[in-house]
Amino acid sequence: MEIVLANPRGFCAGVDRAIAIVNRALECFNPPIYVRHEVVHNKFVVDDLRQRGAVFVDELDQVPDDSIVIFSAHGVSKAVQQEAERRGLKVFDATCPLVTKVHIEVTKYAREGTEAILIGHEGHPEVEGTMGQYDKLKGGDIYLVEDEADVAALEVRHPEKLAFVTQTTLSIDDTAKVIDALRAKFPNIQGPRKDDICYATQNRQDAVRDLAEKCDVVLVVGSPNSSNSNRLRELAERMGKAAYLVDNADQLEQSWFNDTCKIGVTAGASAPEILIKQVIQRLQDWGAQAPKELEGREENITFSLPKELRIHVTQA
């Protein structure tokens, strides 16, 4: 059996930054450090941070007064921001800058009284945060659609003053279809010059497309609640390949690889490289050859830590 590695794969700049914020806060201020929601959607990462003293909570009412709280990479609503400010909590915001960009777009549309449509998955923390950034005081509203059927059923109050934004971790192909449906139904709709799907999502979907063309089976290392990891698995399946989403090597089943010549391995943007190495080692234990990595797009984007945390680090 051959192992073929997608390139790029694994951590993106936003995930790197979010994890670094939690680690730096733990170093500078000591545990407990509270984190609203999983800072990134990966069980291994969250469990590791929890062991170091991070306390993950669902809502701010679980955070004691005078505590430090970190907002996850997925972003939060204005209501959450305002509650933290009202309570005087010390906040470090790990929201991915590319999610913040969408928040800025939504805030601008609300201020103008332009209604907004968010393309995204209901219940995802990023969607909840983005929807909650829209202030309805100017008479507009924000609507959520996931697919073309949602667009067909959608009724808005002001179709002549309408814009769309997207969740950053969607399927590129599916999102293009939804945008086409929106433009067909609402010819005057505004949108970003380039959709809001982030560079890492785009690159990893391009890489898994290349991987699936060359392999019989595709493994995606990532947690079940990771949106971008699920999109990678779905993309490989749409290309006619057996594809499996696994949190770690222990979830692999040897029967998946009967009569398999080439196994493709990739990882979602919140999966650390150590998990990929463990998957490769398990496959090699079962007789696979040393992995070969495909050529891919180089990623050299980095995001800086919040200014206030950099100051605390310097003082420490």
Curated annotation (Swiss-Prot):
Residues holding isopentenyl diphosphate: H41, H74, H124, S226, S227, N228, S270
The enzyme's E.C. designation: 1.17.7.4
MF annotations from Gene Ontology: 4 iron, 4 sulfur cluster binding; 4-hydroxy-3-methylbut-2-enyl diphosphate reductase activity; metal ion binding
Cofactor(s) this protein requires: [4Fe-4S] cluster
CC cofactor note: Binds 1 [4Fe-4S] cluster per subunit.
Keyword Acetylation (UniProt): no
Name of the protein: 4-hydroxy-3-methylbut-2-enyl diphosphate reductase
Organism: Acinetobacter baumannii (strain ATCC 17978 / DSM 105126 / CIP 53.77 / LMG 1025 / NCDC KC755 / 5377)
